[in-house]
Design a protein with these regions (language model features):
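Core catalytic architecture of nucleotide-activated donor-dependent transferases building glycoconjugates
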Residues: 1-164
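A donor-sugar binding/catalytic signature common to diverse glycosyltransferases
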Residues: 174-193
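Conserved blade-ending motifs and adjacent loop-strand segments that build the rim/top face
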Residues: 162-172
Length: 193
């Protein structure tokens, strides 16, 4: 195995940022033994993490659709549940295909809620905590949190906008999100980010 795969790990800057903010991800007293370091590579039981790009994706998804872009890297693994078939779903061929592409790349709040509900119902183990990774406007994130809360059953809902980061940690905020996503029990992304 390549050393970059077998010896790779997050820097102390990332771990320190996570440790300082673990209460944003899920309530500190639950499922995370006191003193257990985030460097331990265990799954965060009960955590659902969603990645919902906004901002630049307003136009970027339209470009991706016009190029008939496939899912990125790990998102294209055959074992993952959501598939994108470039041959039969080319968004350049019809408005229906274009809309289907955009549903994945830039879903509405209602589509996000429906996907979360479905994933939660199909999960073998209960999902009680949700962490939202996004570059969306604060007001949009707060509205999404309210909509998720209205589903009921969440012990905790947090987002990367709730993180309290030091000056240097702000430059690696996306890596903190990636650590959380990597360790979540379930991760929902959009396939192209």
């Amino acid at each position: 195995m390549l050393p970059v795969l077998s010896h790779w790990g997050w820097s102390s800057l990332i771990h320190d940022a996570f440790e300082a903010n673990r209460g944003v991800v899920f309530p500190p007293a639950l499922y995370w033994p006191e003193g257990q370091d985030s460097r331990v590579k265990e799954t965060m039981t009960g955590l659902l993490t969603i990645h919902v790009r906004r901002g630049d994706f307003t136009t970027h998804c339209k470009f991706l659709a016009s190029w008939n872009s496939d899912w990125n890297a790990f998102n294209s693994f055959p074992g993952l549940p959501d598939k994108y078939d470039q041959v039969y779903s080319d968004p350049r061929l019809s408005s229906e295909n274009y809309e289907a592409y955009m549903d994945h790349c830039y879903p509405s709040t209602e589509q996000i809620i429906e996907k979360v509900k479905t994933v939660r119902e199909e999960s073998r183990e209960p999902l009680e905590y949700i962490y939202i990774m996004t570059n969306g406007a604060n007001s949009w994130v707060e509205n999404l949190k309210v909509a998720l809360h209205d589903l009921g059953g969440w012990e905790h809902i947090g987002s990367n906008q709730d993180l309290s980061l030091t000056w240097e940690q702000k430059f690696v905020a996306q890596a903190v999100d990636m650590l959380v996503a990597q360790r979540a029990q379930v991760f929902i992304g959009n396939g192209v980010s």
